[in-house]
UniProtKB/Swiss-Prot annotation:
Reaction equations catalysed: a quinone + NADH + H(+) = a quinol + NAD(+); a quinone + NADPH + H(+) = a quinol + NADP(+)
Domain Flavodoxin-like: 3-194
Protein family according to the UniProt entry: Belongs to the WrbA family.
Organism, scientific name: Geobacter metallireducens (strain ATCC 53774 / DSM 7210 / GS-15)
Amino-acid positions noted as binding NAD(+) in the UniProt annotation, renumbered to this chain: 11
Designated name of the protein: NAD(P)H dehydrogenase (quinone)
Swiss-Prot/TrEMBL keywords: Flavoprotein, FMN, NAD, NADP, Nucleotide-binding, Oxidoreductase
EC number, as in UniProt: 1.6.5.2
Gene Ontology MF term list: flavin adenine dinucleotide binding; FMN binding; NAD binding; NADH:ubiquinone reductase (non-electrogenic) activity; NADP binding; NADPH dehydrogenase (quinone) activity
Cofactor(s) the protein needs: FMN
Cofactor binding note: Binds 1 FMN per monomer.
Origin organism lineage: Bacteria, Pseudomonadati, Thermodesulfobacteriota, Desulfuromonadia, Geobacterales
Domain of life: Bacteria
Length: 203
C-alpha cells in the first residue's frame, strides 16, 4: 500500500513535518511512505532574495511529484505552508493540473489529508486546511483529519499547532521556529491514522 506525501516547503518547516508524517505511515504494516516535492514556480533570483535557496538544498534530493503518481497512490497526504489563509501558489498550480484525474475519477475513494504551517499562532492554519479540503472533496477523496485521540491537541502548557483538521506547525515571522516535538508527534499520528484508514478502504 502506497501513501504519497506531496509537499511544498520554502524554508524546511513543511519538509520536517512531511518526514514526521512519513514516519507515522511506516508504523502501519505494509504501508510505504513516498515523499515528493511539488514543482517550484518562483525564479531562482526571487528565491535567493527570500533566503530560500540554502534551506531548500536540504530536500533537493526529493523527486518532483507528477500527476500520475497521485493516481497510483492508495492515500495522499498533502503538505503546504499557509499563504494568507490558503495553500501556497506552488501547490495550487500543481493541483490545477489534475483535471484529467477528475474526469476519470482517478482519486475517487482514496484517503486524503492535509498538514500545514504558518508564521503565527493564528495565521490561517485551519482555513488553509479547510479550503484545501474542497479540492479533496471535488476529487471524491475520503477526508481524514487529526482526531482528538491525539492528546497533544489538548495541551495548554505551550504554544502549539494542530487541529482536528490536520497537523500543523508555527514557523515564526522569520522562520526561526522549528516544529516542536508535540507538532511532530501530531504529524506522525496523522500519517499513521491515514495509513490505517487507507488500509481499511483498500480491504
Amino acid at each position: 500500500m502506497k501513501v504519497l506525501i506531496p509537499f511544498y516547503s520554502m524554508y524546511g518547516h513543511i519538509y520536517r513535518m512531511a518526514e514526521a508524517v512519513a514516519e507515522g505511515v511506516r508504523e502501519v504494516s505494509g504501508a510505504e511512505a513516498v515523499l515528493r516535492r511539488v514543482p517550484e514556480t518562483l525564479p531562482t533570483d526571487v528565491l535567493q532574495k527570500m533566503g530560500a535557496v540554502e534551506p531548500q538544498k536540504a530536500f533537493a534530493h526529493i523527486p518532483v511529484c507528477t500527476v500520475d503518481e497521485l493516481a497510483a497512490a492508495d492515500a495522499i497526504i498533502f503538505g503546504t505552508p499557509t499563504r494568507f489563509g490558503n495553500m501556497c501558489g506552488q501547490m495550487r498550480q500543481f493541483l490545477d493540473a489534475t483535471g484529467g484525474l477528475w474526469v476519470k475519477g482517478g482519486l475517487v475513494g482514496k484517503a486524503g489529508g492535509v498538514f500545514t504551517s504558518s508564521a503565527t499562532q493564528h495565521g490561517g492554519q485551519e482555513s488553509t486546511i479547510l479550503t484545501f479540503h474542497t479540492f479533496l472533496l471535488h476529487q471524491g477523496m475520503v477526508l481524514v483529519g487529526l482526531p482528538y485521540a491525539f492528546a497533544g491537541q489538548m495541551r495548554i502548557d505551550e504554544i502549539t499547532g494542530g487541529s482536528p483538521y490536520g497537523a500543523s506547525t508555527i514557523a515564526g515571522g522569520q522562520g526561526e521556529r522549528l516544529p516542536s516535538e508535540n507538532e511532530l508527534a501530531g504529524a506522525r499520528y496523522q500519517g499513521k491514522y491515514i495509513a490505517e484508514i487507507a488500509a481499511k478502504l483498500k480491504g
